[in-house]
């Protein structure tokens, strides 16, 4: 068995990043927090099975997702209701960065977090792996 236990994100504002994460994923909570050896705050935001470690950095990087520079392009999260997530995020002041075109087996929306990292949220409309994994519409 293998599963992703956590991810670690560097953030210029731990509070702002925590708000973004818990707005997008309301079941997540602050599991633990403290100060690193330099006295900067860090947090584990998640549930009993998975968390995102949020570490403080002093400046935002200049890498942009999909910019032909190596690095992470986006995090993809499966959700039950993309429309509800989108409403919740917009009501909290976040802007949709990309709303993917309609697909018969899925709905997707994307948001940038406060430090410019891209987050994808996908709702599958089918349990059939062939339909879920059909990317014939990808450009």
Segments (PLM) and residue ranges:
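Hydrophobic side chains in well-ordered alpha-helices
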Residues: 17-20, 85-89
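Conserved beta-strand in the GNAT
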Residues: 53-55, 120
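Acetyl-CoA-dependent GNAT
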Residues: 56-60, 124
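Vicinal oxygen chelate
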Residues: 4-12, 31, 43-46, 63-139, ...
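Core segments of cupin and vicinal oxygen chelate
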Residues: 8-51
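A short, acidic/glycine-rich surface segment
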Residues: 30, 40, 59-64, 129-131
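N-terminal beta-strand motif that seeds the catalytic metal site of vicinal oxygen chelate
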Residues: 1-18, 73-75, 127-139
